[in-house]
Structure formats: C-alpha cells, structure tokens
Amino acid sequence: MLFDWFTFWAQLLNFLILVWLLKRFLYRPVLEAIDEREKKISGELRDADEGRKQAEQAIREWQEKMSRLDAQAAGMLETARKEAGEEKKRLQGEARREYDELRGRLRESLHEEQAALGRTIAGRIRAEVFRVSDSVLNSLADSGLQAQMARAFSGRLSEGGTEVEELLKSGGTPLVLRSGFEMGEEEKELVRKTLADRFGYKGRLDFMTEESYRGGIALEQGGRSIEWSVNSRLEAIDEASSALLDGPDDEMNEEEGHAGKDAD
C-alpha cells in the first residue's frame, strides 16, 4: 500500500491550523475571563478582611474602656474601705451598687453595638460572597460544568444510603428531579443509572428545570428532598464567618466575669 505524503502533510497542516484557531478564539478569551473573575474575587476578599480588622480594633477599644472602668471602680471601692464604721459600710455598698448599675448599662450598650456591627459585617460578607459566586457561576455555566454538577449529585445519591431509600419509599407523588439548568440525556441517564444500580429503583422519574435551583439539584418525593448545591458550600462559609464574629463576644463576656469576681 502506497503512503500518500501529500495527504499526510495536508492533514497535519489542518490540525495545526485548528489548534491555533482554538487557542486564539476559544481558550484565550475563556482563560482571560477566569483570571479577571479571580482578581475581582481577591479584591472583594481583601475588603472583607479589612472589615474584620476594623471590627477587631473596635473590640480592643471596648476592652480598654472596660479596663479603665474597672480601675475607676477599684479606686471607688478603695476610698470606701477607708471610711470608718457604718458610714464606711454604707458608702461602700452605695458605691458598689452604682458601679454594678453603670457596668451593667455599659456592658449592655457595648454588646448591642458589637452585635449590630457583627450582623452588618456578616451580612455584607454573605451578600458579597453569594453575589460574586453567583456571578462566577453564570459566567462559567456551560455543558461541561452542568455535567460535573450532575456527576456530583449522582455521587451524593450513592452516598445517601438510608436517606435515599426512605425518600424512594415515601411515595404519594411522582419522583421529581429539579435543577437550575436543562439536563442533557447523558446527565439524565447517569441519575437513572445511579438510582437503578445503587437502590434498584426503575420507576418513573420526572425532570424539571427551575430558575430557583440555579447552582443546585434536588430529588424530591412525598415531601422529602435530597439536595446538592453550590449554595450549601457557601452556607458553610457563612457559618464560619458568623462563628468568627461571635468568638470575640464570648471572650469579652468571660473577661468581664473575671473582672466582676476581682471587684467583689
């Protein structure tokens, strides 16, 4: 059999031209868009970190105020101890009551301010993280990402065990899979195969597309639901940020309790 060198070199040239076109008009714009998004997210995270530092600075200032108040209270108590007899006891008790009332009012005021500031910062962080993440999802949404989400949900079903079995046994309504994007036949078949191979389910399965499920997939039947979504990962970040903001408040309460015992 003769080897056609002209055909060989023509096909090689066509392949090189195709590689160049893909790199020039497809891969480069996508990579540039991803880099731009990453830079934007980094900037937003820096802003959030700056807000956290400001909150920590405010907490340190409040702690300094409490220390000064403790020092003033200690001076008042020391003066009262120098008084003689019943007058000394009366003045000491009066000073202690005034101190406790003032301390309580100031502590309540500081806690309210701290809680309000924490809620404001946490709300801004949550809103910005969800906004940026939602924007990234929208900009990167394509069939490849959707296929990955379908595979991730199938993995979630495989690991569901008893939870999935109870949902399949609940009955009463058709088994429905809701998603924020139109699933292709390959993704649908993957979910059906997972239910059949793992749980022996070969019944009816309806697929529905709803905007409210953007970034997630849910399997529902009989009032039960099994979900997988990007938002669930973001909620974990939300809980971590809330715990970080609540931490200084708990430490502050502990320090105040020790200070109160020292004053007694």
UniProtKB/Swiss-Prot annotation:
Main localization of the protein described in the UniProt heading: membrane
Gene Ontology terms for molecular function: proton-transporting ATP synthase activity, rotational mechanism; proton-transporting ATPase activity, rotational mechanism
Cell membrane is among the record's keywords: yes
Cellular location(s): Cell inner membrane
Ranges that cross the membrane: 2-22
Keywords: ATP synthesis, Cell inner membrane, Cell membrane, CF(0), Hydrogen ion transport, Ion transport, Membrane, Transmembrane, Transmembrane helix, Transport
Cellular component GO terms, alphabetical: plasma membrane; proton-transporting ATP synthase complex
Bias type Basic and acidic residues, positions: 255-264
Disordered: annotated span: 240-264
Pfam entry (one): ATP-synt_B
Membrane topology: Single-pass membrane protein
InterPro entries xrefs: Alt_ATP_synth_F0_bsu, ATP_synth_b/b'su_bac/chlpt, ATP_synth_F0_bsu_bac, ATP_synthase_B_chain, ATPase_OSCP/dsu
Family to which this protein belongs: Belongs to the ATPase B chain family.
Function: F(1)F(0) ATP synthase produces ATP from ADP in the presence of a proton or sodium gradient. F-type ATPases consist of two structural domains, F(1) containing the extramembraneous catalytic core and F(0) containing the membrane proton channel, linked together by a central stalk and a peripheral stalk. During catalysis, ATP synthesis in the catalytic domain of F(1) is coupled via a rotary mechanism of the central stalk subunits to proton translocation. Component of the F(0) channel, it forms part of the peripheral stalk, linking F(1) to F(0).
Complex and partners: F-type ATPases have 2 components, F(1) - the catalytic core - and F(0) - the membrane proton channel. F(1) has five subunits: alpha(3), beta(3), gamma(1), delta(1), epsilon(1). F(0) has four main subunits: a(1), b(2) and c(10-14). The alpha and beta chains form an alternating ring which encloses part of the gamma chain. F(1) is attached to F(0) by a central stalk formed by the gamma and epsilon chains, while a peripheral stalk is formed by the delta and b chains.
Identification of the protein by name: ATP synthase subunit b 1
Organism expressing this protein natively: Chlorobium luteolum (strain DSM 273 / BCRC 81028 / 2530) (Pelodictyon luteolum)
